[in-house]
């Protein structure tokens, strides 16, 4: 399994001003290809915090670390300095990064924009870093490789640094980060079924979840209590299976759903709604999501 960690930088994330939708978005994209962020660390705009946070994540030897935030021109944008400090590298002018910034100004009708120190700051990268194009924004993303050890094994962690502006982060992630992670993971298929249950408590199906996980240890099975509605308990139940074979993924997820359908019925509950995602055959051109119950025919 490919391992991914994330370091999110910004005081605004820690004081309640900004919700960390960036990490949520990246996590969802990765989960969709069968990979999961195993750790998210959020730190304030401080060289020491950024540096120590990155070192903490690197110590675990992940395949990728995605650093988000702090690449802009303002004084509190110090992520790249913090990353360089952690890696023992200098921060230096990067000609390719400067070219990307100038090209952005030309592309947006600001060809004569003077390159002030604040703007040149966005082109100062840790030595050995590669700038990544930022189509909608100014500050380039950054890619670098970090050698390490995990036990007796030599490892290489790819560190990506992305801007915190959501639409810029998404653009760079989609064009540069996601494809590289996908090459590392190989093609995986994700099958997901979500059941909306009525008439059973979360504690009622807890033993069933434990039993299902023993039978399907690689599956993700998670319950979410939704409170009482008209005096009856409501629970949402997620079931996710990831496999290299689409049919195997579909079949295992369907088997888990059948198991819970039987247990819920036996407990006096019922399925209000069932949604499948990623469970169409490859040749199907219709939507990948439907709401038919387990075992029913689907067009």
Describe the role of every protein-language-model region:
Residues 158-261:
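An accessory alpha-helical subdomain
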Residues 42, 49, 77-184:
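Proline/glycine-rich low-complexity loops and linkers
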Residues 9-11, 62, 67-75, 163-164, ...:
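Glycine-rich beta-strand-to-loop/alpha-helix junction loops that act as flexible
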């Amino acid at each position: 399994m490919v391992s991914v960690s994330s370091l999110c930088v910004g005081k605004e994330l820690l004081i309640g001003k900004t919700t960390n939708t960036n990490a949520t978005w990246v996590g969802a994209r990765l989960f969709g290809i069968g990979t999961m962020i195993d750790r998210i660390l959020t730190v304030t705009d401080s060289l020491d915090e950024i540096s120590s946070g990155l070192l903490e994540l690197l110590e675990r030897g992940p395949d990728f670390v995605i650093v988000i935030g702090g690449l802009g021109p303002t004084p509190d944008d110090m992520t790249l300095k913090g990353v360089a400090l952690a890696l023992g590298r200098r921060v230096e002018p990067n000609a390719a990064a400067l070219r990307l910034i100038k090209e952005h100004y030309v592309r947006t009708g600001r060809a004569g924009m003077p390159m002030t120190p604040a703007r040149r700051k966005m082109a100062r990268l840790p030595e050995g870093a590669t700038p990544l194009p930022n189509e909608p924004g100014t500050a380039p993303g950054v890619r670098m490789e970090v050698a390490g050890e995990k036990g007796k094994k030599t490892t290489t962690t790819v560190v990506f640094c992305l801007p915190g502006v959501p639409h810029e982060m998404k653009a760079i992630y989609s064009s540069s980060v996601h494809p590289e992670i996908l090459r590392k993971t190989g093609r995986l298929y994700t099958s997901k079924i979500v059941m909306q249950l009525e008439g059973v408590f979360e504690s009622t199906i807890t033993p069933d979840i434990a039993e299902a996980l023993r039978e399907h240890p690689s599956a993700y099975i998670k319950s979410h209590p939704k409170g009482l509605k008209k005096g009856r308990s409501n629970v949402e139940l997620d079931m996710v299976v990831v496999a290299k074979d689409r049919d195997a993924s579909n079949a295992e997820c369907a088997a888990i759903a059948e198991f819970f359908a039987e247990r819920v019925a036996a407990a006096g509950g019922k399925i209000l709604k069932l949604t499948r995602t990623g469970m169409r055959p490859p040749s199907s051109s219709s939507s990948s999501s439907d709401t038919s119950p387990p075992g029913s025919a689907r067009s």
